[in-house]
Amino acid sequence: MKKIFDIFKIKKEERVSALVALIIACALNALTVIKYHSQFSQITDNYHKLFVKTFHVAGFDPLTYSIVSHWDTEYNVYRHPLLAFFMYIPNQINQGLIMLTGINCVQFVVGAILVFCAFYSFIFLYRIFREVIGTERFDANLLSAFYFSFAYVMVSAMVPDHFIMSMIILLCTLYITGVCMKKGRQLTIWQTILLFVFTAGVSLNNGLKTYLAALFTNGRKFFSIKYFLIGVILPAALMWGFARWEYRTFVWPKEMARHEAKMKKNKEATAKIYQQYRDSTGVKDSAKVEAAVKKIIKDKAHAKYVRDHKQIWNKNTGKPIAKGEFMNWTDKTTSRSQTLVENFFGESIMLHQQNLLGDVLRNRPVIVKYQSAVNYVVEACIVVLFLLGILAGRKSKFLWLTLTFFLMDAALHIGLGFGINEVYIMTAHYMYALPIAIAFLALKAKGKNLKWVFRGLMLAITLYLWISNGYLLAGYMLG
């Protein structure tokens, strides 16, 4: 057990950087507390309504606030099967604080979780650069600061959604497997199960990344009968079975209750239309009344259809590739080229000044353009550095593991179009591939002059991102 927690010990060379990272993580979360404390410290009987109606930072959901205030399985149980249960102890801590203080302390409880996740994400990324890739200390600090200057890495570290929780587990997975690769060790069954439970428990599709990491680390031994059955098949089956049980136990009864309430409401509304029609027209013939009421209901349905299609949430939702429970989440119509420029490599890294931190389901177009050419130049430089980094590290198995994580998300979001209209909110799931690839370029920058040209460019980009994103983010949260 002691060995498990050794990974959280801060090493001597990490202390100064760790302190800076901790201060920044606390400052980011302080902005969220300042913006919403007056509303979210209230005690209410409907926390879901309060948080969802009030919290507006891009497309992030404040469901964690809701669950930590009043425990329930509010997350989609198939996408986040264990996340609500991970939040049970924070919920109990918050209940104790509510009894002691008389206010809802949810922002402080969740804020502590977010600070922890952001802080150790920085630590694990720094260790990847130093211990796995082998960069110099200066470059490790610079590249870590570069990654945390990304707009939606900063935002993920301060909003009550699951993305920063996924990021710490994914970076921990990469760090552990990277060390195993370097030392010629294999990922054990218990390590695989533990990583899978946390990774898939928070976000089910990320569980596949655990198995990819194990495959890259263990090679052919990944398919040995004992490892594959106990470390792969068993936990995956149990996770899916648990998600199904969770749905039947917690979600299905609520859905049935809502369905029955809706049917009752529709029945009452239809009866009211019948009565109003008879009273206003004096028609007694039941067949004529039936036909007239059907027409009224049809006209109302059509009017609602027209109204809904004028709403921004409908305009910004693309058409699915096919119909189905999961395929309905896909998108075949949103422009991929514009998305790559403005959102995938754009908004994810640099905030747009227009429609700042807007929500595509409320008030933001899917595609927003930068007002200055400088933003596109910076974006192009980052993408070129990323590609050069891939070229420089093309022989590294660890880099290809990281890129597999990246490509898996690219296929999901850009290929299938899952969440493509707000792909930037998923930044924490995959964008760490950029600084990791660029780290291999740092290794290739030999010679004093070339090394400092590289460092100068990275430092300039990092400072620009911190100043630009920090200014816009602080302005939004304090405005």
List each language-model region with its residue ranges:
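Membrane-interface alpha helices of multi-pass inner-membrane proteins
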Residues: L187-N206, T210-N218, I230-A237, G456-A460
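Transmembrane signal-anchor helices characteristic of membrane glycosylation enzymes that use polyprenol
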Residues: K9-G59, S66-W71, L234-R248, I461-W466
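Short acidic/glycine- and proline-prone juxtamembrane loop motifs at membrane-interface regions
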Residues: M158-F163
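Specific aromatic-rich, kink-prone transmembrane helix
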Residues: M165-K182
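Transmembrane-helix signature of polytopic, membrane-embedded enzymes
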Residues: L125-S149, W400, T404
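Perimembrane helix-loop-helix junctions
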Residues: M1-I7, G207-A236, W252-K265
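Lumenal/periplasmic acceptor-binding loop at the mouth of the active site in multi-pass
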Residues: P62-F108, A291-L388, W400-T402
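Transmembrane-helix motifs of polytopic, lipid-linked glycan transferases
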Residues: A112-I133, V384-L388
